[in-house]
A protein has these predicted regions:
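Gly/Pro-enriched, hydrophobic low-complexity segments
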Residues: 121-207
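N-terminal leader/targeting segments and the immediate start of mature chains
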Residues: 19-56
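Hydrophobic, aromatic-enriched alpha-helical segments typical of multi-pass transmembrane helices
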Residues: 114-119
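Sec-dependent signal peptide recognition
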Residues: 2-11
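Hydrophobic h-region of N-terminal signal peptides that target proteins for export
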Residues: 10-19
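N- and C-terminal low-complexity/disordered segments
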Residues: 26, 46, 71-72, 79, ...
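A short, amphipathic edge element
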Residues: 45-47, 100-113, 152-156
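An acidic-aromatic
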Residues: 56-100
Length: 209
């Protein structure tokens, strides 16, 4: 029995070492190509969204989904109803969802062990340098589309893939608490629009002195 345990730990150590030593660049490039290529990634864009908080796909009795109109400019600006939301981890979530982190020169990548998420085999990619704390992205092994993000105390599942202007994007995100595994936020994108420039009338935070 002791020999079996030792062998198991040895195999695990070997797998971890192989994952950490693998070159992540091909996986990063394939993930970008899977959604349409670098030129199709979003930089300035508008989202129309519907969302609610709770543990069920439908809002609790007496509650309704919230509507939101957002404008984002990667990497760090996000306006809701023309007001910039300021420092917020959600900006990094959006950069992961849009794969903007994969083209950030500050990003450092590392292959991490594969997982199985809801029956789907996923390959893992850890991102540091451009985001704190580190993010773990999991790409569907067959499609190489982003399926799951593990970050901070949550994990995110992305689904309902759609296509717009040559770009494939996940229109649905469900966020779960890592500790309990229970969902707490449901989000759907109802409209996506690529913008050539920021529209007029947006609030611009004053630079700190």
């Amino acid at each position: 029995m002791r020999t079996i345990i030792i062998r198991s730990f040895f195999l695990l150590a070997v797998c971890l070492a192989q994952a950490q030593s693998a070159d992540p660049k091909p996986l990063v490039e394939k993930a970008i190509q899977a959604v349409g290529g670098k030129d199709k990634l979003l930089k300035i864009y508008r989202l129309k969204e519907v969302f609610h908080f709770g543990e069920t796909p439908e809002p609790a009795a007496g509650k309704k989904r919230s509507l939101r109109d957002s404008i984002l400019s990667q990497p760090d600006m996000w306006w809701i109803n023309k007001k910039e939301r300021g420092p917020d981890p959600a900006k990094d979530d959006a950069r992961a969802w849009s794969l903007d982190l994969l083209v950030d020169e500050k990003s450092r990548f590392e292959i991490i062990p594969d997982i199985v998420d809801e029956g789907r085999k996923c390959v893992g990619l850890k991102i540091t340098g451009s985001v704190t704390p580190a993010m773990s992205l999991y790409l569907d092994q067959e499609t190489l589309l982003l399926r799951r993000l593990d970050w901070r105390s949550d994990f995110y599942r992305f689904s309902e893939w759609k296509e717009y202007d040559g770009l494939r994007y996940a229109s649905r995100t469900v966020i779960f608490k890592t500790k309990s595994g229970k969902p707490w936020f449901f989000h759907d994108i109802t409209e996506l629009e690529r913008l050539a420039q920021l529209p007029a009338g947006l609030d611009h935070p004053k630079a700190s002195k």
